[in-house]
Amino acid sequence: MGKPHPLKPGDTISLVSPASFLTPEQTEGGIKYLTSLGYRVKTYPSTYRADGYLAGTDAERADDLTAAFHDPETQAVLCARGGYGSSRLVPHLDFDSLAKTEKLFIGFSDITILHAYLNQRGLPTLYGPMAFTFGYEREQWVYESFADVISGRSTIPTAAPKGDAVHPGVAEGIVVGGCLCLICDLLGTPGQIDMTGKIVLI
């Protein structure tokens, strides 16, 4: 399995909602930021749909996610937000076919579930900001780091504030993990994350 290619101006980012919905104002804020970077943005019905707490039925959200991955004009698939609902898509998705597209997949929080299944199939993904993130004003480093990483200018968010290390040192390896409650939900399932020899992000 190959790695997703860095994005370049003019590339298309498909905006999908596998979990909870966004308000139109939040969605437009995310689209405005992405287009300011020079990217085209493609939306799907679930991008603007609301069905209770979710962005449509499980089948509708899964169909949109599948369509985005298999769209030949799309280079990256960006989740609108997390919240709840991604785990309900698992029975509706063919992760083998999604991973083979080698599209850049981006999201965090509830999207942990989808990362886990795609990573199992050899597709590296980006645990990072979503459209929801850019629907509000954020610190400048959030915008800079996101733009640098998706374009391949940096593999780490160099502009982010530095934390304090409990045990300083250097580690190299494959990073896995995500939202702790979702990591726990995956235990004992086919999507359980293999952490052997990995760097675990929580």
Where are these regions (language model features)?
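Conserved anion/nucleotide-ligand pocket segment
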Residues: 124-188
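N-terminal glycine-rich "phosphate-gripper" loop used for MgATP/nucleotide binding
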Residues: 76-87, 92, 108
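ATP/NTP phosphate-donor binding region
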Residues: 1-73
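Structural motif
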Residues: 13-14, 40, 75-76, 104, ...
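Active-site beta-loop-alpha substructure in enzyme catalytic cores
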Residues: 180-202
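Short, acidic/small-residue loops that bind anionic groups at enzyme active sites
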Residues: 95-118, 124-130
